[in-house]
């Protein structure tokens, strides 16, 4: 039997999404001598990325200011126009932009494949010397004698369904690091272990979730408007008074990303997010876009919808939560890649400073404090009552109250009230 090998490094990052890749790049930008390892469970970077996406470039501008000129695929399709439809069963109305707070606008944003963006970011990371290992899931957290996180172990290979070892069995490798970043996305197994072990959710609201279903379509060129972004609310979820809605993003190469998000706190046990998505696609306004087209890819993923109230403690001895592992999705904007990237950058800066100061396996409390005072905190506070308002008061009244709350926070009017999740 092969013995388990051990690999030392300065920082190991679990997850090759926007947060993990941004953290890796930022670490090497600060100190090129740092040994940074990034583990991705997918067969390649981007294999498990399923966002639409419309990307706010704020964090990308900070991380790689010349990304537009460096061949980043996201630069191909800037948002050209933005629509918000309120659907009935057979019709639609356009919600005027003036009714929505400025943070809901998409001018200056870009639409494209987040998986392609991650693949490009991985290339930038590797060029800086980051060791990127796709196909290596982190299966176990390693702890030191004092209980601090000291790294992770990768999954054993060649294990039969009954747990026995096949002839080609190979044990996983111990990746031992001064600091470990968990960038697993929503509901990652190791992240849940860290939350429980270090009681990270003691001072926040419970996280709540939605289910996002997405398809990629090749559509008739006559129906394609590159850069057009459409978000919808109302039917069909209005029939069950459930929070959620649809999106249609016209991307490059004659494709649209179409999807549907359903909050998982729906009251009617017969609601099926998948069936609601099928009904959505048959709405006359949506079907007209897809007519003559062909679905080429599809998938689904969990989405953190708890917002600011549900952000846990982010740092603990030897480790930190970044990206959707912590939950930085701006639910009304349906955006989280920019906040995920910024969280990774802030964690990287805190870890680099700690290592430069001779520390290891300590709690990166500066990361937690700096994130809460950053533009991530400012942005999420503006929308923190949106999901709770709809969950408590229903789709129609809740949406109105959420809009009023966002406007009041934007204009700094009234007392800040933080609603709790049910």
Q: What role is predicted for each listed range?
A:
Residues 41-91:
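N-terminal FAD cofactor-binding segment of flavoenzymes
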Residues 327-333, 345, 349-395:
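Active-site-proximal substrate-binding core of FAD-dependent oxidoreductases
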Residues 1-8, 163-172, 324:
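A short, basic/flexible loop-to-alpha-helix module at the beginning of a structural domain
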Residues 19, 44, 187:
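Conserved Rossmann-like nucleotide-cofactor binding loop
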Residues 10-37:
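N-terminal Rossmann-like FAD-binding beta1-loop-alpha1 element of flavoenzymes
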Residues 390-422:
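C-terminal auxiliary extensions adjacent to catalytic cores
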